[in-house]
Amino acid sequence: MGDREQLLQRARLAEQAERYDDMASAMKAVTELNEPLSNEDRNLLSVAYKNVVGARRSSWRVISSIEQKTMADGNEKKLEKVKAYREKIEKELETVCNDVLSLLDKFLIKNCNDFQYESKVFYLKMKGDYYRYLAEVASGEKKNSVVEASEAAYKEAFEISKEQMQPTHPIRLGLALNFSVFYYEIQNAPEQACLLAKQAFDDAIAELDTLNEDSYKDSTLIMQLLRDNLTLWTSDQQDEEAGEGN
């Protein structure tokens, strides 16, 4: 068994054991062999890093909320400790994101030819996602540059997906979902977020007959998430407008 196959086997095993750091390091090594990734390899890479970064994002949110509460309580000594711990988690999160972004730029996006538009959209979406995760914890000038990089990657992926993919394709739908979340949460642009999500949902509904049997479950799940977000975001906007009128 070659190195590549051993690494893939290790990644699958680590996934079953829910040891995502191990899974990510195996898939990083596979990617660095600089050979094209199959759809299964691509998904293993994505799942590994999504879980690794997801754990840090979740920890960061919890600690940030504790930090705000501690600040309100005026407990300086505790605040110092909480702040230091938040910064530690932030560094871990940044390291993970930069690892992924480096793999994308050095190998994955770089090695896509013009006809591999599905892979290219997948990787550009990933690039948008990991810059978005950096934007969640960044501030000042640093935040501006990662926000710009995230939007640029999403936009490039979005253009290719509109030209080359069916509106019901799960990768195109997943991209629309994440890009709309970027507008809502990072850019604080609810109208743009709703417009993008609604357009993606409506386009997919109009072409439901093109739904591929293999991806039916994935596509309908993402459509449901788009609709859930739209419901939530429009009710938030209505609440705000009602508040403004008082």
Curated annotation (Swiss-Prot):
Gene name for this UniProt entry: YWHAH
PANTHER family: 14-3-3 PROTEIN (PTHR18860)
Family: Belongs to the 14-3-3 family.
Naturally occurring in which organism (per UniProt): Homo sapiens
Domain of life: Eukaryota
Keywords: Acetylation, Phosphoprotein
GO MF annotation terms: actin binding; enzyme binding; identical protein binding; insulin-like growth factor receptor binding; nuclear glucocorticoid receptor binding; protein domain specific binding; protein heterodimerization activity; sodium channel regulator activity
PROSITE patterns reported for this sequence: 1433_1, 1433_2
Name of the featured protein: 14-3-3 protein eta
